[in-house]
Amino acid sequence: MHYFPVFADLNNRPVLVVGGGGVAARKVNLLLKANADVRIVAQKLNAELTALFELGHILWIAGEFNSEQIRNVFLVIAATDDEYLNERVFRVAESQQKLVNVVDDQARCSFIFPSIIDRNPIQVAVSSGGTAPVLARLLREKLEALLPQHLGAMADISGKWRHKVKTKLKTVTERRRFWESLFNGRFSQLLKNRQTEAAKKELELQLDKDYRGGFVSLVGAGPGDAGLLTLKGLQEIQQADVVLYDALVSDEILELVRRDAKLVFVGKRAQGKQVAQENTNALLVKYAQQGKRVVRLKGGDPFVFGRGGEELEVLAERQIPFSVVPGITAAIGATAYAGIPLTHRDYAQSAVFVTGHRKANASDIEWQTLARSNQTLVIYMGTLKAKDIAERLQQFGRAGSTPIAVISQGTQARQKTHIGTLTALAEIAENAPTPALIVVGEVVTLHDKLAWFGEQKFAQKRPHFTLDSLRIESVA
């Protein structure tokens, strides 16, 4: 690290600016925001600086620069178009061990100005160390868009209440949970709407509550690629005390969980070791009743074949508060990464999602509906029943030549797309690693044209082998 980032307290501290033009004015305005005692050395001032002088905001030392002017100041800034004068200011400041900045001359700077995102009292500074100022500015612009304007008001009010909160809530965990809940709740929304007094009242009401009760967030982790986790989902897993996750949550996403959170595996896999749903429900209740902030992290979307509704029913019965963060379901993510659009005007006017893993006493499937042409059928957890699925679809009218895809480990680096026809579905599914998704419909023919994920697409190398009507393509 070439520059050490610090935030300097300039309140009422003397700062010397040498120069009276536009560049100097920009620096002066920045310094005044920090309540610095600004002194300007210049033969003359531009209109902006003249106005500040006449208002009494700055002290003007009219005349030439000399070394005595630096003696009792905290910072020195040289902002003239005279290279010789700037060099002299730098050397004098260095000799007196003063922090000095010569504008646009990094070699003559003992400190530099970062790009600033100001949400007073919250401040974010971005610097490239002078190597790429345009890049730093672009980064600042992105952060400006991300950080809400009311952050400063949130920090200001919470700072005034810190002592009361510390008195009321004795443990660090209680206080952390209180502030996290406050900043992510109605308090923040009121400040966003410029309802400051109502926000203060909300804080007071929340503090009077008993915050020992826990909370559960049901979060969809998406299909695997960590980049597809929603921003709100990321916020939830980084605030959690306990995360209960299933087998479909990728290691990439688990790496994003708060480091000191407890990770509890509650996964289910067909023909594998499973955690019973009743045990998962019991754990959710147990941790919430211990006053913990619990995240139930599910692959894909928790309300699409994820039994999320069943888990929330248990929480509702016990009056445990909860929230839901949707995720990108596997049918959306995996097909997109495989270059298979779910709908297309030429091939499919609808898409149907079904599960191949049904409750033992479930009513029979409407195969006639699933076998319709001009639609895309996506089957979750269907590889073990692929033979029966293929037979039933053909029995109810789907042609054996209908294109199909089996997408394994969708959206992840290990993704494999297995292409074939309905007659070969059982054979294809048997050779496909799980978890896998079955796609049935003419849209699969677009895969060759639209596949984009994986290095081999761009290298024009598509390793494959043929097994009757089976083709396997790997992105690994």
UniProtKB/Swiss-Prot annotation:
Keywords: Cobalamin biosynthesis, Lyase, Methyltransferase, Multifunctional enzyme, NAD, Oxidoreductase, Phosphoprotein, Porphyrin biosynthesis, S-adenosyl-L-methionine, Transferase. Residues 214-476 are annotated as: Uroporphyrinogen-III C-methyltransferase. Residues 1-203 are annotated as: Precorrin-2 dehydrogenase /sirohydrochlorin ferrochelatase. One of its GO terms (molecular function) is sirohydrochlorin ferrochelatase activity. It comes from the Bacteria. The modification Phosphoserine is found at residue 128. The keyword Glycoprotein does not apply. PANTHER family: SIROHEME SYNTHASE (PTHR45790:SF1), SIROHEME SYNTHASE-RELATED (PTHR45790). In the N-terminal section; belongs to the precorrin-2 dehydrogenase / sirohydrochlorin ferrochelatase family. Then it catalyzes the NAD-dependent ring dehydrogenation of precorrin-2 to yield sirohydrochlorin. Finally, it catalyzes the ferrochelation of sirohydrochlorin to yield siroheme. This is Siroheme synthase. It comes from Actinobacillus succinogenes (strain ATCC 55618 / DSM 22257 / CCUG 43843 / 130Z).
